[in-house]
Amino acid sequence: MIGIVQDQKLLIFDEISSAYDTDALAQTIKSRYPMNKIYVYPDASGGNRSTNATQTDIEILSGSGFSNQSPRSNPPVRDRVASVQALLCNGKGQSRVQIHACCRKLIESMELQSYTEKGEPDKESGYDHMADSLGYLIWREFNPLFARSGKPTGIRIY
């Protein structure tokens, strides 16, 4: 999914669900948004090398000119889900995320994502990927543990 942070709100306005691998995803992003600085928020496991790959997913994204914002390790699932819920509707009843109607896969994922009895996302249902991607973005940009918390603070190096 593609979005921007504006006035401390997250606006999701596009999604890419048809890319068959990370290289195809990077090319699609570059073709749709050739003039924009792109920040990516992948799953931290994207830095792991598989036995049949010469590059990790994060290396591919970084090599395509995107700024990697993934943490060294993924946040706890419950914390990430709570971060998404807080942006959807906080304690004051305010929503700080808007998802454009064209983002059908993300909306479907948000509506149909289920969880196991242990509280983990049900990976068998097939609805976890887009919801997870939204969670990683929100965790990184709006989590009060990070200095940014939805506000630009200049250059950050990790």
Describe every region a protein language model picked out.
Residues 1-5:
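Gly/Thr-rich phosphate-binding beta-strand-loop-beta motif of the actin/hexokinase/Hsp70
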Residues 123-158:
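Charge-patterned, long linear interaction tracts outside catalytic cores
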Residues 6-122, 144-145, 155-158:
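Mg2+-dependent endonuclease catalytic cores in nucleic-acid-processing enzymes, primarily RNase H-like
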